[in-house]
């Protein structure tokens, strides 16, 4: 939507909220407005839990998932919850919600309180999360059909206070956005079949003030890959699901463990305040200063390189520089990306912000990542973007129920992909 149209739509909403001193309405308008940017680096902080409680504090003891065949099914039904009390069982197909065909109800679900939705896949995911949320005490009429039953049932469910339980269960934001700092930024292990597994939380070093292993993150990663090389592993899984991003240079340095030749990682294209124009500069990540105009960031040829099959596990919570790990692996001769959906699609340079009335702050990116042809890469446009799987894992009922029960379906498919490349 053009800026003038956005202003025309949201300025009156903000003006009414100001006139009536309705902070909840102002906060929701601010979130809806920033969501139109469709970038994971555009956010409103902090989360206003008063608004969350008022708008989405009630749940129905229900989590739903959309299958590849278009059906919306129950993948978690809380014992003793409203849905279970109405006779709904795991795998039940939701036919209607709040008197509307579920497809329409889903499309009309407000996701103002969700994280940003750069891609269409993320939009649908967030609509599924908030479809089953409502103010406490709200009644919703639902038509559903349990597996094995010949006819559907109709029930009225009442939203109950649940401590935002289902929102917490389905929160797919990046790791550092939703939890405490880990004890180390890189974890490694050897899986059955002599497969190396390494998980990267983010491309930053653990702060010295935080408890844990303060070995530099790059060193931890190189130690892991070098140990796999020495052990002659049959393949490597690099898990960047919900990776929070960080340093682009660190990602390029990670990739040296897989690249025999110097390869462009990106050109960083920044808006120069003095001119308002984009220019390619290499940034000093420690000082924030722009150095080396026109220069790109390169993956240097590694001194010790793994050349066997590599798989990157991704989800939509993998954001920013974390997406660069998936991109670098996908570009390898024996590299594949595995996941139900692609990465977040937010690959620009983040860091700018502005303070807003009522104590809120809006963050946004100020630079672009360009490929060798100096075209924006990975960032979402028109709802499409991110680093996509070579072949998406099918969201079947069986897979959806496995995921909901805690089974690592993505790793299972990742191991299959490795075996196919051996």
What is the predicted function of each stretch?
Residues 5-12, 16, 25-32, 36, ...:
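Extracytoplasmic/secreted proteins, especially bacterial periplasmic and envelope-associated proteins
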Residues 1, 11-22, 31-42, 79, ...:
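Sec-exported extracytoplasmic/periplasmic mature domains
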Residues 175-422:
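C-terminal "post-core" interaction segments
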